[in-house]
């Protein structure tokens, strides 16, 4: 399995979906739906936030981030390539093993923002 990691910064609106999961190991992940508008079109993403040794980000997002808020997310794009059972042993037209690629966004920070019409720019909310 290959993993490709990049850095991204997205500004958008928090959607309705939010799910918090706790693991037997004591870890936690919070997943939110996040909408980014490009022109007249909205693109939706699912962003995962995890608790770490230095910051309980999943707990913070689960408790404090609300539907409809504008936030800026900093995170990483993580691409997982894997071969599901139904494709095991199969190859494409070039003889390469068939795989599926799945891209996820893992957030490592967020900040609330608002649009200042007077200055015509986004600003952070404390």
What does each model-found stretch correspond to?
Residues 1-126:
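Single-stranded nucleic acid-binding surfaces, predominantly the OB-fold ssDNA-binding core
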């Amino acid at each position: 399995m290959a993993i490709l990691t990049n850095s991204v910064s997205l500004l958008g609106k928090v959607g309705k979906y939010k799910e918090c999961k706790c693991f037997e190991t004591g870890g936690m992940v919070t997943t939110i739906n996040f909408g980014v508008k490009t022109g007249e079109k909205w693109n939706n993403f699912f962003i995962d936030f995890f608790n770490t040794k230095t910051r309980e980000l999943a707990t913070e997002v689960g408790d404090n981030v609300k539907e409809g808020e504008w936030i800026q997310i900093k995170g990483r794009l993580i691409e997982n390539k894997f071969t599901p059972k139904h494709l095991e042993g199969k190859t494409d037209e070039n003889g390469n093993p068939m795989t599926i690629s799945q891209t996820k966004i893992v957030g490592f920070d967020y900040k609330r923002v608002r649009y200042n019409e007077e200055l015509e720019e986004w600003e952070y909310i404390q």
